[in-house]
Design a protein with these regions (language model features):
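Fe-S-dependent hydro-lyases/dehydratases of central metabolism
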Residues: 1-206
Length: 206
């Protein structure tokens, strides 16, 4: 787990980090964050419970417990990742563990949307490319540089042309995915608009 977690804000154009591989198809949201952790009042503590049951069963051998994966921030997965229930706790748990981007063969649609909403880009690659990365990463740590504008990931002598929905890409590059920051940056325009709307004015005169 990354002890220096900071929530992403604004424009996202570049992501650099160490990869962590999670091998297996159809890894669902209940495995990512078990249902008993959904009762939390806030998302602050869900990062430490990510893959709780899988990690307990593997007794320290789960990728998220290996020393070599400490402070990893780019998750490499296989197909249909994030399937199952639509719980937004799943991407929140991954983000608060330290994940900043996910590269996989395919993603469940709702999980993908939930990731985009909190600033986690999800990229796809062909099966062979994913397997090549996972195989390489099994032997030594792989550090990737992701250029979101070019949809390109590179590391040493490796280059991968990533695929991402154009609408999602535009939101990250412009910062539009982050509604709060967008509102704060345009506070003056919002105030002016409010002042121009007659139905927002009220009077106590009867």
């Amino acid at each position: 787990m990354n002890s220096e977690f900071r929530s992403p804000i604004g424009k996202i154009t570049q992501i650099n980090g160490k990869c962590i591989s999670l091998v297996g198809n159809d890894i669902d949201t209940d495995r990512i964050i078990p249902a008993r952790f959904l009762k939390c009042v806030s998302f602050d503590s869900v990062g430490k419970s990510v893959f709780e049951d899988d990690r307990k069963n593997l007794k320290g051998r789960h990728p998220f417990d290996l020393e070599k994966n400490k402070n990893a921030s780019i998750l490499i997965v296989n197909s249909n990742f994030g399937c199952g229930s639509s719980r937004e706790h799943a991407p929140q748990a991954l983000m608060r563990w330290g994940i900043k981007a996910i590269i996989g063969e395919s993603f469940a649609e709702i999980f993908y949307s939930n990731c985009i909403a909190i600033g986690i880009p999800c990229f796809t690659l062909p099966t062979k490319s994913i397997q090549d990365i996972q195989k390489y990463n099994a032997n030594k740590s792989l550090f990737l540089e992701i250029d979101l504008k070019k949809s390109l990931a590179k590391a040493e002598d490796l280059n991968f042309q990533l695929d991402i929905k154009e609408s999602s890409k535009k939101m990250f590059l412009s910062g539009e995915w982050d509604a709060t920051s967008t509102l704060l940056e345009n506070e003056n325009l919002i105030e002016k608009k409010n002042n121009d709307l007659p139905y927002l004015e009220f009077s106590t005169d009867l």
